[in-house]
Regions:
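Active-site helix of classical SDR
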Residues: 109, 145, 153
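Substrate-binding pocket helix/loop in short-chain dehydrogenase/reductase
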Residues: 85-86, 93-98, 180, 191
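Short C-terminal tail/terminal secondary-structure segment
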Residues: 134, 211, 222-236
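Alpha-helical segment proximal to the catalytic Tyr-Lys
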Residues: 114, 158-162, 219
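Conserved glycine-rich cofactor-binding loop
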Residues: 13-14
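Residue(s) in the substrate-gating loop at a strand-loop-helix junction
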Residues: 129
Length: 236
């Protein structure tokens, strides 16, 4: 981006969200992250918020805009998993994931885009997943929410595109995180065999894709799904 922007990243205290916030900070932007616990990277504003709680979001976004200015870039990253095979998954397992990963994104997008509409500029980037395109056994809840983000981004594009607002999905594949590092080596090797690139992505590779989408060079890209998966989900 050619000028400093106000960026909000939800779920910015670890993993991909943390890396995304770091990347925006390094590029000189004003960055806030929502967290339920912990803190975001050095140089950002960390605000306590739960995307399932509208009141906490109202307070958090008001604090961000009071300290950093109207939100110009939103990265909706906060998400949870409740993995279980279909026949064992409870209604609560399904509904909890939908409430965070889909309804939670709606709550944040609705609030953050108010200022974007007034400014006639905005970038909305939703963090999806390759399993939203491929499906995944034991993740009917999670994969359904990630697939739904594609429809959300495209509907935002149709509603708000004329106001200078873009909306896209970044769909990571397997990422090299503490969680994947704890998997048995044999299981890691099996996963890597499925990936044409033969390796997991780094969180920074996802973060750089997000910051590029937020920049001026990607201003004519909207309603797109950008895979960062080493070729795992190609054709979808």
């Amino acid at each position: 981006m050619s000028e400093s922007r106000t960026v909000l990243v939800t779920g910015g205290n670890r993993g991909i969200g943390f890396a995304i916030a770091e990347e925006f900070i390094a590029a000189g932007h004003r960055v806030a992250v929502t967290v339920r616990s912990g803190e975001g990277p050095k140089g950002c504003l960390s605000v306590r918020a739960d995307v399932t709680d509208s009141a906490s979001l109202d307070v958090a976004i008001a604090e961000v805009e009071a300290q950093l200015g109207p939100i110009e870039v939103l990265v909706a990253n906060a998400g949870i998993t409740r993995d279980m095979l279909l026949m064992r998954m409870t209604d609560e397992d399904f509904e909890d994931v939908v409430n965070t990963n889909l309804t939670g994104v709606f709550r944040v997008v609705k609030r953050a885009t108010k200022g974007m509409i007034k400014a006639r500029f905005g970038r909305v980037i939703l963090i999806g997943s390759v399993v939203g395109l491929l499906g995944s056994a034991g993740q009917i809840n999670y994969s359904s929410t990630k697939s739904a983000l594609v429809g959300m981004a495209r509907s935002i594009t149709r509603e708000l595109g004329a106001r200078g607002i873009t909306a896209n999905v970044v769909a990571p594949g397997f990422i090299d995180t503490d969680m994947t590092a704890e998997l048995p080596e044999e299981q890691q090797a099996d996963y890597k065999k499925r990936i044409p690139a033969g390796r997991f992505a780094s969180p920074q590779e996802v973060a750089k894709t997000v910051t590029w989408l937020a920049g001026d060079d990607a201003g004519y890209i909207s309603g797109a799904v950008i895979p960062v998966d080493g070729g795992l989900g190609m054709g979808h």
